[in-house]
């Protein structure tokens, strides 16, 4: 809302009331935002002229269940989402944020038939943001001055290359 990066935001959910409620909540923040964005609950057909579709749907991860255990459940969910989006005439970019994110990004790539540069996964970007925030708290610096990344496959095999972490572009961790 505050970055004014789009003129329309459409929320699609199998639970239509939830999508409507979330769209209403976000819309109520518009009077305080520097944009005239339109926010609404919608249908897959609304994706026809979208530049970006963010997929964050999926089965919940149960206690003791690995991200890879989610694969079969989420494959079914993604099949029911990607096909109607493609059928709408969507010709933009997919951004995948559902676990297991790296594998689900490949699933969207396969199901959509889109070129690889139009199917992107969030990967370890959220983990990197969390790491940078925790480091900024620990070292009492602005998070924007922390340059550290989590790399690898999102999940149990990701890691931090500590020798590459920087604070204020001066201090090597």
Regions flagged by a language model, labelled:
Residues 8-10:
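Short beta-strand element of Class I
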Residues 171-173:
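Conserved small/polar residues in nucleotide/adenosyl-binding loops
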Residues 57-59:
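Conserved NAD(P)H cofactor-binding loop of Rossmann-fold oxidoreductase domains
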Residues 54:
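N-terminal Rossmann-like NAD(P) cofactor-binding module of classical short-chain dehydrogenase/reductase
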Residues 12-49:
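Conserved N-terminal Rossmann-fold NAD(P) cofactor-binding segment
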Residues 15, 99-101, 123-128, 149-157, ...:
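Glycine-rich beta-alpha junction loops
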Residues 131-140, 158-167:
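Short, surface-exposed amphipathic charged segments that create phosphate/polyanion-binding patches used
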Residues 67-132:
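Rossmann-like NAD(P)(H) cofactor-binding subdomain of soluble oxidoreductases
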């Amino acid at each position: 809302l505050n970055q004014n990066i789009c003129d329309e935001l459409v929320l699609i959910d199998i639970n239509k009331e939830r999508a409507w409620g979330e769209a209403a909540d976000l819309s109520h923040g518009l009077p305080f935002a520097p944009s005239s964005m339109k926010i609404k609950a919608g249908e897959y057909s609304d994706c026809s002229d979208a530049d970006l579709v963010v997929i964050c749907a999926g089965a919940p991860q149960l206690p003791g269940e690995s991200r890879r255990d989610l694969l079969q459940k989420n494959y079914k969910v993604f099949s029911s989402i990607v096909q109607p989006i493609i059928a709408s005439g969507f010709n933009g970019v997919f951004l995948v944020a559902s676990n297991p994110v790296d594998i689900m990004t490949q699933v969207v790539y396969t199901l959509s038939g889109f070129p690889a540069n139009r199917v992107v996964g969030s990967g370890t970007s959220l983990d990197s943001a969390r790491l940078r925030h925790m480091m900024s708290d620990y070292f009492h610096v602005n998070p924007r001055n922390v340059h550290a990344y989590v790399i690898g496959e999102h999940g149990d095999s990701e890691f931090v290359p500590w020798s590459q972490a920087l604070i204020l572009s001066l201090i090597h961790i």
